[in-house]
Structures are given as C-alpha cells and as structure tokens.
Amino acid sequence: MQNIRNIAIIAHVDHGKTTLVDKMLLAGNLFRNNQNSGELILDNNDLERERGITILSKNVSINYNGTKINIIDTPGHSDFGGEVERVLNMADGCILLVDAFEGPMPQTRFVLQKALEIGLKPIVVVNKVDKPNCRPEEVYEMVFDLMFSLNATEDQLDFPVIYGSAKNNWMSTDWQKPTDTITPLLDCIVENIPAPQQLEGTPQMFITSLDYSSYTGRIAVGRVHRGTLKEGMNVTLVKRNGDMFKTKIKELHVFEGLGRVKTTEVSSGDICALVGIDGFEIGDTVCDFENPEALPPIAIDEPTMSMLFTINDSPFFGKDGKFVTSRHIHDRLMKELDKNLALRVKKSEEDGKWIVSGRGVLHLSVLIETMRREGYELQVGQPQVIFKEIDGVKCEPIEELTINVPEEYSSKIIDMVTRRKGEMVKMENTGERINLEFDMPSRGIIGLRTNVLTASAGEAIMAHRFKEYQPFKGEIERRTNGSMIAMESGTAFAYAIDKLQDRGKFFIFPQDEVYAGQVVGEHSHDNDLVINVTKSKKLTNMRASGSDEKARLIPPVQFSLEEALEYIKEDEYVEVTPKAMRMRKVILDEIERKRANKS
C-alpha cells in the first residue's frame, strides 16, 4: 500500500497559487530536464489565463520520496462556491497560501471556512516574502486571528508555517533565511497532513467532478471512500434522490503528473477516474453491486441571480458565429449543466428563450464568455436577483461586501453604498487605507464596481460573497441616464459623432457598423435619445475655403462583458457574438418602442 497525501490549495486571486503548483510539479521531476513546461500549467483554458482566476478545479499528483501527493487546485472566487465544496471533500488537509504583504483576503475566508468545517488540517504558506515592504510576521498574526474567528479547533490552530517565494522557487521555515529549493514545504506536507484512513469493507466512491472525452464520453472523477475498486467490476450507481442503477466499470485511471494512467485497481484514499459509467451526476455514489450504501450528498449553494438568454435576432445575426440557432444554444446549456453544479436552466414559455440562474454576475459572465469563444451568438438580458418567500415574507439575497480604499475616498464610498441600502458592519484603519465591511443586497452590488472604481480613482479593492436571505430592503436607484440609440442602420461616421458629442458619451468608434435600435452611447439626460450617427458630410461643401474643421473625437467608452451586463436597463439586451459585443433595445423599431411604452 503506497503512502498517499490528498491536499487542497486555498488562496486569494493573484497570491501565487498556480505558480506554487507549477513549482511543486517541477520538484516532483514531472518534466524532463530539457522540457520547458511553460507558466501556469494548471490554468489551461484561455479565460483563466487572461483573468488570472481559476474557475474549474484540477487534479495533479507528484511523487516525492515514495509518497504520492495529490494536489487539488480550488477556485478562490465565491461565485464558484459550488465548485469549492465538492473539491474540498477529496482532501485530507489544505495549504493556505497568503501574500506576505496583503494578508488573508475576504474571498480566502470563504474557502477556508468550508475547509475548517470539514475538519481539514491547514499548513500556512506565506508567499512573496521577497517583495519589498512585506510584513510576514503581521500576516502570520492575521491568519491566526482569522482561523480563531472561524472557530478552528486547537489542533487546527496549531498549524505549521512556511515562508518563501514560489516565483523564485524557494521555501523555508524562517523568512530571513532563504533556501534554494521548495522541499521544506513538501517535507512539511508529508509530516503534518494525515494519510487518508484505510476503510475496509464494500467499495464506496463519491463522484466530485467529471471529465469529458469525445472518445469514451463522460468520465467520473472522485475519491475512493472505502474498499477497493477494480477494473471490470459490477457496481451500483446511487443517485442523489436515492434511485439506483446497476452498471459496470470499464476502465480505471489514477492521476499521475498532469495526466491519467490506466490501472487495474484503486484502494481507499486515492483519487481516481472511472470510464464506462453512464448517466451519473456530480454528487452520486458508486458502491457495491450486492448491498449498495450511499454516502450523504453535499449541499450545494443555491443560485442567487438569473438572466434571460435568447437567440440572436439582431440585424447582424449570423455574421460572426458558427452556432446561432436555438437548438445549438439549448444543447450547449444542457452540456454545461453536467459540469457546472450551481447552474440552473429553465426553458421559457416563448420559443428560443431560457432563464439561466447562477451564483452571481461573474459566474454567468464566464459561461457567456466561454460560449462566445466557442463560436456561439446569443443575447442576454439584465441580471435579475432571485427573490424567495420565507414565512410569507419576501426575501432577497444579502452579500457581505468588503471594500479597501485610501482614506480620502472613504466618505464617498460609504455614501454610495448606503444609498444602495448597504449597512456598514465594521470599519478599520490599516495604515493609509481603510477596510470597510457592509451587508448589502445583491441588487445593489450589480453595477456598483464601476462606480466605486470611478469614485476612488481606481484605487478600491472590492470583494463580495453571498451571506444569507433577508427581508426585502426596498427600492434601489439604478442608472438614471438614458441611452443614445441609432436611428438607422449603416456605418457610423466621425462627422456625425463629432456633431453629437455634447449630447453624451459614445460607445462606438467611427466606421463601426451599427443598426437601428442599437445603443451607441449614454445620454446626458434621463430620457432616451434617438440619433443619426450614419450621416456623412455632403461632398459639394468640401471646397468652401477655410470652413473645413477636423472632427475632434473623445475616445469612446469600452465595456467588458460584466460591465455591459451591469449597465443595461430592463428594456435592453447585450448581444454577444464571437467578434463583437453590442448593447441594443429589446424592441428595435422606434415607433414600436413608443407604442410599448404607452401601453
């Protein structure tokens, strides 16, 4: 029986989690000496590399002095809370990675709390101690206080600490004495993290994630809880609702390095992948053929936000995308449900529309962005918060919001948040910056980020996570400015935009193709304004001497997908295609729009 350690890595965005795993892989001699592995081995989809966030959890394993260490990378952002909980169930211990300057951040707290509740043993790694003005000792104190406030047990509070710099490939027990390898960390893992318990008896395995291969179909991944699984064995699949299906394991794989290796049997405590089990879902149990016993299912966070997805019916329909029909979008959303636990999809009464609910704007925008890159065209409506009726009272989701700003901007920010029904819970000074904590309705957070950044000259750091449902807090003011809407379809000209600049801000560049009903800018007043941006200068006028002024254009405002989703009003859609992102009115025709407003 080989030695196994299952370990999850918890860290805030950008504290160097993925880099640390890269170095651990190198230390386990996964790559030949002449083979260049590239950076960020684990964040293997483009979106994750661009945003620097880990969305899906990955499994890799290294062999260190005869001990097999399974490393499980967890997503740090609470919008992917559904991911976090099932992943932690595969581990026996965790590494909490914190930045030696910033200390533990609110998002880390979310994952750490889940880990401590399950009873994982933590190891704290203070990373980036090579940065100037870092404060490792204070950070250590902060971590201790955080764990204490999360009700950690005495055993958990007695955690080992390792200092180092993952980027420069060293770890040490004392931050003033750099070493030249990261083996102190690996030794620490082997000594402090308990080996998984060997449970004898009938086999049980909990399915915590899945892989997909176009060749063999869906592959179940999970940790063997008890007993031994063998290739070709007959097993029972127990669903979350208690239904049972008899099935058979065709192939067994274990993780080795970055890939999977076929094997004949896997015993309890190791993490493996099963091929040939049909119709499983995440959270099901694979157990004995004769006397099946299911493991208790994990609770997954309920969705708090929903959006309308619909087929692209704009005049530019089908220009960029490969998949544009409702059948394509329907199949893609169904496929996403397999992997994405916290997602719900409901078909609307109207044809070609779906209500998609998730954990927050980030969760849903990552899905839209992924679909866009795969060549889908679709339109999305304004994000709506999901209300619940609890004991006859209408309730809405409340989030815990943390904003860290320089002192001089704090009053502006507090004013902005309280206007959106946020209640201040705590305020503390840390040097020249202030840490503000609020309880705030999710409705108020939609569209808040852009305003906070503008008010604080881009200095604010903002993070939020779902807390609970509370009674409805009343109306919240939304964007008050109207939109500027294109009058007819065609090419936008600098000449026309120049003449209209005093009406508001534009979102389009000259020479962009626009269509009637597209939102091309923000009006400076609260009503919508229909403008003609396709008007060009008449040629006969060209020769009048001295009257030819150059058009001086203010650069247009450009939106990211999240910003656009938070910006639009109820009667607007964001149109998303592989090459472009536009905002438009739901009803394109101006006269029809007026009619609808009157009724």
Give the location of each predicted region.
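Residue-level signature of catalytic and energy-coupling elements of molecular machines
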Residues: D14, L20, G52, I71-D73, ...
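Conserved structured catalytic cores and adjacent interaction surfaces
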Residues: Q2-T19, A91, F101-Q113, G119-K121, ...
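Canonical P-loop GTPase G-domain recognition
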Residues: K121, K131-E191
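Acidic, low-complexity intrinsically disordered tails
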Residues: R582, L588-S599
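A short, contiguous, amphipathic alpha-helix enriched in charged residues
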Residues: S314-L337, K550, I554
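Conserved nucleotide-binding/hydrolysis modules and their immediate coupling elements
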Residues: Q204-M307, P315-K319, I414, N481, ...
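P-loop NTPase switch module centered on the Walker A-proximal segment
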Residues: M1-V98, E102-P104, M142, L210-S213
